Design a protein with these regions (language model features):
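Short, positively charged and aromatic/hydrophobic N-terminal segments
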Residues: 3-4
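Hydrophobic helix-and-loop "lid/oligomerization" segment in the mid-to-C-terminal part
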Residues: 7-9, 15-134, 154-155, 172, ...
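Short amphipathic alpha-helical segments and helix-helix/interface helices
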Residues: 66, 124, 148-149, 554
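Mid-to-C-terminal polyanion-binding domains and interfaces
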Residues: 68-72, 313-317, 323-358, 411, ...
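Active-site cavity-forming subdomains of large catalytic enzyme subunits
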Residues: 128-194, 198-207, 241
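A short acidic, amphipathic alpha-helical/loop segment
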Residues: 146-150, 371-374, 494
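Histidine-centered active-site/metal-ligand motif
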Residues: 163-164, 364, 442, 529
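Cationic, low-complexity basic patches in intrinsically disordered or flexible, solvent-exposed regions
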Residues: 214
Length: 588
């Protein structure tokens, strides 16, 4: 049990300056110091910097069984998770089987609202009726002991490919390919689920060559599938270092040339310049639409977008995902609006609480993480939102079954929590663990389930747990202090040598002191975004922040009064034009 929960206040300081050259300083700040380290980071090599796939546990077993199934024409089931890692992973193995001329398989993606995460007995029985002999999981399975035993009893061999932590030992599967296995000797422990599938494909290709029976496609053609690997790696927010950096780097290269109809149509619809697509385009534009499929309907819709071979079909799924993503935005906005009203009423009647706990049985659990994040950012405290799953989402024919909610399930509330950046949520929930059925997540985000009769005591339990907070005011280290005159095409080009950015390789953070916000503007359909022109007297640059109000920064941001800005530097490509600008992080 964690006895202390750390509350962090934002305090900025600049990392020690070692080099005048910006790129050298940024590399040094990331612990990249030797010439060999610099070369490896700045020049990812697809051959030299990827590990042997057979270093993954059980890879030989998995490859042997899959090759046997392909040779004998056995029917294979591919069971993947419903998120923006699992769906591309399912599409990846789908496309690989098509590439080698194997068609006797089916993709199964569970309904998020009805079946939930991982394997389930109803779905396995559906696959057994479809005469599946080999079941391959993607981005799930490592904890599904009972379900895998059930699949075996129904005559299936099971190969698990996953990247999550094991629990209570390993399931009795034929093969478990997972870099996080306790006995794994694989050099990289954190790769996404689709990344594990890519390693499986590489192993299958190498094994076929070694056996003198190479697959019937031109050497290197499989690399066109890296667009899905890059998409999933960036979507799943794994650390973009080591092998992940290589996969993301080359994944983006392939995405910029992608022949995938669905993605090309999606880029066009969103006015994304495919030649300049970045990790931000993936994270803010593409990933939400893939995730919208499971949150608002069925994940199969996103899968069909990624695997579409007909232009009309691809166009239809682009429009559908865009529509349900817009519906998702409206629903999240509605939840946020209702939650704010409840918060205001509670403050008026009970006073302010250090933890916000709110819910409504009509709120859809799949949307609550997005809503909780918005509220936590505005109110600067941990937020726990709960709702109840509704068992009404139809299944797509051939990809799943259906089930009715049991009385026990109807009595369970599910929710999401988000931190304001100050409180470790897992530690907080650990102290109040007797109130949950289950919980999990990370320091800043998590999920939980709770019995209906216990929801009314959850707020008090979390508030009591939050009394074990120590304020140590840690510093946020900034890469460098710059002036507006330092921003140029050349400096941006230097910074972008470090891309792609993400977890483990965050965008460089800079401080700009004593700059003047000349004009503060709002933009967007509902004026939900912020745009500011900054001047130092000689130079002017635009800075933006999405879904932000100037009021959030208090007295630190006033038009016509000099301020200190913490920001990233970026180059934006949109609708055929480019712009160097700042992305606002904070003011002080």
């Amino acid at each position: 049990m964690c006895d202390i929960i750390i509350l962090m206040s934002k305090k900025y300081s600049v990392k020690p300056k070692v080099f005048d050259n910006l790129i050298e300083q940024l590399l040094y700040n990331r612990g990249i110091k030797t010439e060999a380290e610099k070369d490896k980071f700045l020049n990812p090599d697809f051959v030299k910097h990827l590990h042997d796939p057979f270093l993954l546990p059980d890879m030989k077993k998995a490859v042997k069984r899959i090759l046997k199934a392909v040779k004998n024409g056995e029917r294979i089931g591919i069971w993947s998770d419903y998120d923006a890692d699992g769906i591309p992973g399912g599409a990846l193995l789908h496309d690989f089987f098509k590439l080698i001329g194997f068609d006797n398989f089916i993709n199964y993606i569970p309904d998020r609202h009805i079946e939930g995460y991982g394997l389930n007995s109803d779905g396995i029985e559906e696959l057994a009726k479809d005469k599946i002999k080999l079941l391959i999981t993607i981005d799930c399975g490592i904890r599904d002991h009972k379900e895998i035993e059930h699949a075996k009893k129904l005559g299936m061999d099971v190969i698990i490919t996953d990247h999550h932590e094991q629990s209570n030992g390993l399931p009795e599967a034929l093969a478990i390919v997972n870099p996080k296995r306790a006995d794994s000797k694989y050099p990289e422990k954190i790769i996404c689920g689709t990344g594990v599938v890519w390693k499986l494909i590489e192993a299958l290709r190498l094994a076929s060559l070694a056996q003198g029976k190479p697959f019937d496609f031109a050497q290197g053609k499989e690399k066109w599938l890296l667009d899905l690997v890059g998409l999933a790696t960036l979507s799943d927010m794994v650390p973009l270092v080591g092998e992940n950096r290589v996969l993301a780097f080359y994944g983006l290269k392939v995405l910029r040339k992608s022949r995938r109809l669905g993605l090309s149509k999606l880029f066009s619809n969103l006015k994304i310049n495919k030649n300049n697509i970045t990790e931000d385009d993936i994270g803010f534009m593409i990933t939400p639409r893939i995730n919208a499929a499971s949150r608002m309907g069925h994940p199969l819709d996103a899968f069909k977008l990624l695997t579409a071979s007909d232009e009309a079909e691809a166009e239809a799924y682009v429009k559908h995902l865009d529509n349900i993503n817009n519906e998702r935005k409206v629903m999240v906005a509605g939840i946020v609006k209702e939650a704010k009203k409840k918060i205001k009423e509670k403050i008026e009647s009970e006073g302010e609480k250090v933890v916000i706990v709110l819910g409504n049985p009509n709120w859809r659990p799949a949307l609550l993480g997005l809503a909780a994040g918005s509220i936590a950012e505005e109110y600067n405290r941990p937020v726990f939102l709960w709702g109840r799953s509704h068992f009404a989402t139809p299944f797509a024919q051939g990809y799943g079954g259906s089930k009715k909610a049991s009385r026990d399930e109807e009595n369970v509330l599910k929710g999401s929590c988000r931190s304001d950046g100050a409180v470790d949520l897992v530690a907080l929930m650990e102290r109040a663990k007797d109130n949950f059925i289950e919980f999990g997540g990370h320091k800043l985000s998590g999920g939980f389930s709770v019995l209906f009769e216990k929801i009314h005591t959850l707020e008090d339990a979390l508030i009591e747990a939050s009394t074990h907070i120590v304020n140590n005011e840690p510093e946020i280290l900034v890469d460098a202090e710059l002036k507006l005159e330092n921003i140029s095409e050349n400096s941006v080009a230097e910074i972008l040598k470090l891309a792609p950015f993400g977890a483990g390789n965050e965008k460089p953070l800079f401080i700009f002191r004593d700059i003047l916000p000349e004009k503060i503007n709002r933009f967007g359909k509902t004026k939900e975004h912020l745009s500011i022109n900054f001047s130092d007297g000689l130079h002017i640059i635009r800075a933006i922040s999405f879904f932000t109000s100037p009021d959030q920064f208090g007295d630190a941001l006033k038009e016509g009064i000099k301020t200190n800005l913490v920001a990233n530097i970026e180059k934006s490509f949109y609708n055929g034009s480019s712009e160097i600008r700042l992305r606002i992080v904070d003011f002080f």
